[in-house]
Amino acid sequence: MYDRFGPLECANGSWVIGDPNKDHLRFEQSGMSHWVGGVEAPLVPWKAFTDMRIYAAATRLGNSKGLAKTNEIMANLRGASVSGGGPAHLTAHLRNGRGDWQAVFSHHARWYPPGEIRILSRFLGQVTERGEASRLGDPAWVSAVVEKLGQLPRGLPRAHKGAIGQILDDCR
């Protein structure tokens, strides 16, 4: 049984993105909460989400703000530009003119397999694009989906979209 998948983890019966002892996102029945410094920010209701993606490096070092800044400075010295790097975060587009939303989360001490990060991001994108984000508030449903996501081959990114769609259909 899978109790974690990339930065997604089941902690005390709830699914969270990020280290649950630090800054993280929590899947609640009515929406997603963002915990920063032990304080809960206002919950974003599931019906507000139209798209969702996750950005995380395999290791904490890859999500280091200092390393990202150093890379940016070095690239600028060479006359180049850099995109990416920085803290692990989830981005989403919200309905009703609320625009883009971004929430930073703390990287676990453990390594995230890059294939799991890609699959998780595609899963979150597809579930929101289908208008089914509210399902993320059901821990049993998320557990069933994560179990099936864990069976997907990590090295075939083109096949993931169809496979994830089939998993979502099967777990209705």
Model-derived regions: residue spans:
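Eukaryotic intrinsically disordered, low-complexity regulatory linkers and tails enriched in Ser/Thr/Pro
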Residues: 1-24, 35-41, 53-172
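Short, solvent-exposed coil/turn segments at beta-strand boundaries
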Residues: 23-32, 47
